[in-house]
From Swiss-Prot:
This is Ribonuclease H. The keyword Magnesium applies. GO terms for biological process: DNA replication, removal of RNA primer. NCBIfam families: PRK00203.1. GO terms for molecular function: magnesium ion binding; nucleic acid binding; RNA-DNA hybrid ribonuclease activity. Binds 1 Mg(2+) ion per subunit. May bind a second metal ion at a regulatory site, or after substrate binding. Pfam families: RNase_H. GO terms for cellular component: cytoplasm. Monomer. It comes from Bartonella tribocorum (strain CIP 105476 / IBS 506). Mg(2+) 1 binds at residues 13, 51, 73. It is an enzyme of class 3 (hydrolase). The gene is rnhA. Its cofactor is Mg(2+).
Length: 155
């Protein structure tokens, strides 16, 4: 009998104090009545980089191939991975206007993190009262606060 893939909901957010500046990311993973919170950050980063890192770290935390519904308030992340990335690759990591793609390494890492999962990307409006998006945002801000307090991010 074939085993059924685990269905996981992931909620992500990134935050940056200054852009660039100190940034944090947060993610909530939910499956079969269980939840796990993840967060981290970088001392010199951008909001878009933290949005990407939230999705990357959440997907990498999965221990087996899963069916994933990933919710982000970043149109940049959702469109980048679901609409733009194939064109970027065909154009040798250049945009339609021939500029180098920003955050290329993170996009490549995100694509790799998605490769063993079936990921459905969903956009949610940020700062609009969506409970899990608000929690992911709070985790991202917690990472920034911890860095400011003791000079390091959670591990």
């Amino acid at each position: 009998m074939a085993s059924q893939q685990k269905v996981v909901e992931i909620y992500t957010d990134g935050a940056c104090s200054g852009n660039p500046g100190v940034g944090g990311w947060g993610a909530i993973l939910r499956w079969n009545g269980h939840e796990r919170e993840l967060y981290g950050g970088n001392a010199h980063t951008t909001n878009n980089q933290m949005e990407l890192m939230a999705a990357i770290c959440a997907l990498k935390a999965l221990k087996e191939p899963c069916l994933v519904d990933l919710y982000t308030d970043s149109v940049y992340v959702r469109n980048g991975i679901s609409k733009w990335i194939e064109g970027w690759k065909k154009n040798n990591w250049r945009t339609a206007s021939k500029s180098p793609v920003k955050n290329m390494e993170l996009w490549q890492t995100l694509e790799d993190a998605c490769s063993c999962h079936a990921v459905r990307w969903h956009w949610v409006k940020g700062h609009a009262g969506h409970p899990e998006n608000e929690r992911a945002d709070a985790l991202a801000r917690k990472a920034i606060a911890q860095y400011r307090e003791n000079g390091r991010f959670p591990t």
